[in-house]
Amino acid sequence: MNMNQYYDLDNGKNVMFMNDASSTSGYSSSTSPNSTNRSFSPAHSPKTMELQTDFANLNLPGGNSPHQPPMANSPYQNQLLNNGGICQLGATNLINSTGVSFGVANVTSFGNMYMDHQYFVPAPATVPPSQNFGYHQNGLASDGDIKHVPQLRIVEQPVEKFRFRYKSEMHGTHGSLNGANSKRTPKTFPEVTLCNYDGPAVIRCSLFQTNLDSPHSHQLVVRKDDRDVCDPHDLHVSKERGYVAQFINMGIIHTAKKYIFEELCKKKQDRLVFQMNRRELSHKQLQELHQETEREAKDMNLNQVRLCFEAFKIEDNGAWVPLAPPVYSNAINNRKSAQTGELRIVRLSKPTGGVMGNDELILLVEKVSKKNIKVRFFEEDEDGETVWEAYAKFRESDVHHQYAIVCQTPPYKDKDVDREVNVYIELIRPSDDERSFPALPFRYKPRSVIVSRKRRRTGSSANSSSSGTESSNNSLDLPKTLGLAQPPNGLPNLSQHDQTISEEFGREKHLNEFIASEDFRKLIEHNSSDLEKICQLDMGELQHDGHNRAEVPSHRNRTIKCLDDLFEIYKQDRISPIKISHHKVEKWFIEHALNNYNRDTLLHEVISHKKDKLKLAIQTIQVMNYFNLKDVVNSTLNADGDSALHVACQQDRAHYIRPLLGMGCNPNLKNNAGNTPLHVAVKEEHLSCVESFLNGVPTVQLDLSLTNDDGLTPLHMAIRQNKYDVAKKLISYDRTSISVANTMDGNNALHMAVLEQSVELLVLILDAQNENLTDILQAQNAAGHTPLELAERKANDRVVQLLKNVYPEKGELAMTWIPCKVKEEIDSSSDESSDAGQLEIKSEEMDIETKDEDSVELDLSSGPRRQKDESSRDTEMDNNKLQLLLKNKFIYDRLCSLLNQPLGHGSDPQDRKWMQLARQTHLKQFAFIWLGAEDLLDHVKRKGASVEFSTFARALQAVDPQAYALLVNPT
């Protein structure tokens, strides 16, 4: 017979109970609780037994589970918590130093693992005071003491997306699981802190499922001694070490499907053994564990995990006692999964399409699921609001191996637009509404018939009234006939007739509006006397021209003819001879194009003639300029959409470009392929045409950011063709063109130079320095790669090293200096590879004008900048003297020796003299990449023309008088 204490669930206190059975189920199996032979606790009343049985069978999640059990807020549950009868600490099972468990472990309290044992709270006297750790003796803290209870708090969440790798992919080095706020520098990692506790503890990190408080089949590994150690991972914290645990260098190994059950079962079994403080489980427990694992393995999300953090105290006997409820991180999604990975469009087959839609478009994308992906086209206004959207059409079979989508573009909302419309393309995953970033630009081009109609309309307004022999239908912008005019004496009054003779105005208000117009008033003012003699206005009835219109009498026909002749005479007298000639030239110009098979104008033909008829072409340009027909020239394009400038660039006839620009031809007009004349010149490698554009003074400024239908600017085309001289001229004209990304794959000029593996172009681009250099270096293309990352993928050590030398570190500005050895090698290699018939590539010196310590401006001019200060004796010397002195080996070596010595005074006596010299000569921007005085003097030697001798000498005198004397008096 046993004497046991049981907790009275109804009265909220412990009572003594005599039991002659050894059952641990809470009551004797041999005696009914209703028997009158014994004194039973009220805890064994039928109602209580029913509730107790229901409670024991409940599958309650841990305290930190995002899914609260249905009974969490029930009156019965609240009564248990208020009375202190149940120690609900989430997934914890408190174990005292003697190995006796206390607290209640429900079915899910051990990571959602089933347990067939019920643990009751011992009597208060049995709980040693030293085991409380901020809790009351019943294991619960009162409301007033919550702030003193040990608890874990996540300081840094893990990244939202991380690549899960298979074990076969774990060779070599890979990125670790970083924190959500991690940057290139500084990096952060998942971090958790233990609060309200001042003793030694262990913080454990393990991998859990997102929808259950249960381990995940994937492995959370840390590389140690060339091997991967699987979770859980433990970190010791204490008052001396601090209570912040940072888990670094962790990776996630994706478990193959055929091993999911095995790995999950092993993890759950190990965790249950640890929590029960046993060596092995019973056969029944193993069987139930297998069944539970089978259920979880079927529905487990293999592309989403989370971290579980737990805190323990290790007792003297080796028992691990939980200190606080576990906490769980945000979900970590598999970056390479089609279901949860990051969506990204890497490249478009073409960035343009027609407004009618149904154009085939191929998208190269990151991994997507064919059953869970959409391609969205959308347009935004100036405020970023979506004003139009549509989805591309494609079948599941059009998604090729999860990395390419062949789709048909949707039609644009307005099929009659007469200009290009810029929209965007993005991917959408309907399951979680994830969208690709960045959205790539796409251009809708108008229909050719609309463009042709627009071009004809531009010239037709003048053409309609161009000739004196034209019909009076278009004269003076008046109606075909004016029915209310009174003819000369002798003619009948027109108002006596019921029908009007007007064919253009059907309502009285239209006529009134016309009469009240400014043009009509001017007509009356300019020729009012003649009008009074010829016609008298009569406000007769103006009726609608119907089908039953009365026949016009013969005398009325004479009236119409008389008025037509009248207005024709007025028109001839009103138009000056030069205007008549203007209209005739314009008419011939347009008619010739319309009657031509390729719709070439006279200007197109004389420029593109096989034999360059310079005199004839120049005369034609002069005539067009004389009559100010620039609008006609810009609007009348041939069948290919080429202007006269396009044709001149195609035929490599640069001598026509400046006259055409002077006449007002637009150099930014695009042809049907989206190419401007400058695109054509670069594509055809006609350097003289490029120079004519860049050196001319066009009335319309050249726009080097315009892209063609392939998404390329002229600079992109020059880099792709590896044309150093063309790229150099374009960059000299507009440095901002370097940062323009092509619309096909998002690569800027630096990206493309890396892909071409051209060190010469890289140095050219990096030398064209401005305040945006750091942005260019850190810019990502559509695939999310920076130029340095692309270079590392190409594995060209020379290119990688060059970019690393200028790449910004730790928030510093990008280095504004290209190693001299690299430039010398480029010069020598360019000289050797240059052919006799090609332009020689030379590396010009780039001069630096230092305005202050934070801004450095470079001059791309070919000649060095020389500055003299007549007020100082030293500045009267040629600045090149500094270069000559430093080329003297004795002086150079001696200065290096002196400047590499410690300063010996000031706030930092150990600071080297050359560093102080760099600050005083405004070269502080470069000091962080210099290792010693040799680097400083090498820079001054190269850039001596931009470093004043007097400034350098005065700074050197303040830093080291001995070095100053050596420089001023080298003899």
From Swiss-Prot:
<dbReference type="GO" id="GO:0006963">
    <property type="term" value="P:positive regulation of antibacterial peptide biosynthetic process"/>
</dbReference>
<dbReference type="GO" id="GO:0005654">
    <property type="term" value="C:nucleoplasm"/>
</dbReference>
<feature type="domain" description="RHD">
    <location>
        <begin position="147"/>
        <end position="339"/>
    </location>
</feature>
<keyword id="KW-0040">ANK repeat</keyword>
<keyword id="KW-0805">Transcription regulation</keyword>
<feature type="region of interest" description="Disordered">
    <location>
        <begin position="23"/>
        <end position="46"/>
    </location>
</feature>
<dbReference type="InterPro" id="IPR037059">
    <property type="entry name" value="RHD_DNA_bind_dom_sf"/>
</dbReference>
<dbReference type="GO" id="GO:0045429">
    <property type="term" value="P:positive regulation of nitric oxide biosynthetic process"/>
</dbReference>
<comment type="function">
    <text>Transcription factor that plays a key role in the humoral immune response as part of the peptidoglycan recognition protein (IMD) signaling pathway. Rel-p68 subunit translocates to the nucleus where it binds to the promoter of the Cecropin A1 gene and probably other antimicrobial peptide genes. I-kappa-B kinase complex (IKKbeta and key) and PGRP-LC are essential signaling components in transmitting the lipopolysaccharide (LPS) signal leading to cact degradation for NF-kappa-B (rel) activation.</text>
</comment>
<dbReference type="GO" id="GO:0000791">
    <property type="term" value="C:euchromatin"/>
</dbReference>
<dbReference type="GO" id="GO:0005737">
    <property type="term" value="C:cytoplasm"/>
</dbReference>
<feature type="repeat" description="ANK 1">
    <location>
        <begin position="640"/>
        <end position="669"/>
    </location>
</feature>
<dbReference type="InterPro" id="IPR011539">
    <property type="entry name" value="RHD_DNA_bind_dom"/>
</dbReference>
<dbReference type="GO" id="GO:0050829">
    <property type="term" value="P:defense response to Gram-negative bacterium"/>
</dbReference>
<dbReference type="GO" id="GO:0006974">
    <property type="term" value="P:DNA damage response"/>
</dbReference>
<dbReference type="Pfam" id="PF16179">
    <property type="entry name" value="RHD_dimer"/>
</dbReference>
<feature type="repeat" description="ANK 3">
    <location>
        <begin position="710"/>
        <end position="740"/>
    </location>
</feature>
<feature type="region of interest" description="Disordered">
    <location>
        <begin position="826"/>
        <end position="877"/>
    </location>
</feature>
<feature type="compositionally biased region" description="Low complexity">
    <location>
        <begin position="23"/>
        <end position="41"/>
    </location>
</feature>
<keyword id="KW-0597">Phosphoprotein</keyword>
<dbReference type="GO" id="GO:0030547">
    <property type="term" value="F:signaling receptor inhibitor activity"/>
</dbReference>
<dbReference type="InterPro" id="IPR036770">
    <property type="entry name" value="Ankyrin_rpt-contain_sf"/>
</dbReference>
<dbReference type="GO" id="GO:0050766">
    <property type="term" value="P:positive regulation of phagocytosis"/>
</dbReference>
<dbReference type="GO" id="GO:0042802">
    <property type="term" value="F:identical protein binding"/>
</dbReference>
<dbReference type="InterPro" id="IPR013783">
    <property type="entry name" value="Ig-like_fold"/>
</dbReference>
<dbReference type="InterPro" id="IPR002110">
    <property type="entry name" value="Ankyrin_rpt"/>
</dbReference>
<dbReference type="InterPro" id="IPR002909">
    <property type="entry name" value="IPT_dom"/>
</dbReference>
<dbReference type="GO" id="GO:0000977">
    <property type="term" value="F:RNA polymerase II transcription regulatory region sequence-specific DNA binding"/>
</dbReference>
<keyword id="KW-0677">Repeat</keyword>
<feature type="compositionally biased region" description="Low complexity">
    <location>
        <begin position="460"/>
        <end position="475"/>
    </location>
</feature>
<dbReference type="InterPro" id="IPR033926">
    <property type="entry name" value="IPT_NFkappaB"/>
</dbReference>
<keyword id="KW-0963">Cytoplasm</keyword>
<dbReference type="GO" id="GO:2000647">
    <property type="term" value="P:negative regulation of stem cell proliferation"/>
</dbReference>
<dbReference type="GO" id="GO:0005634">
    <property type="term" value="C:nucleus"/>
</dbReference>
<dbReference type="GO" id="GO:0048935">
    <property type="term" value="P:peripheral nervous system neuron development"/>
</dbReference>
<dbReference type="GO" id="GO:0106222">
    <property type="term" value="F:lncRNA binding"/>
</dbReference>
<feature type="region of interest" description="Disordered">
    <location>
        <begin position="453"/>
        <end position="496"/>
    </location>
</feature>
<dbReference type="GO" id="GO:0000981">
    <property type="term" value="F:DNA-binding transcription factor activity, RNA polymerase II-specific"/>
</dbReference>
<dbReference type="GO" id="GO:0006967">
    <property type="term" value="P:positive regulation of antifungal peptide biosynthetic process"/>
</dbReference>
<feature type="modified residue" description="Phosphotyrosine">
    <location>
        <position position="626"/>
    </location>
</feature>
<dbReference type="GO" id="GO:0140896">
    <property type="term" value="P:cGAS/STING signaling pathway"/>
</dbReference>
<keyword id="KW-0399">Innate immunity</keyword>
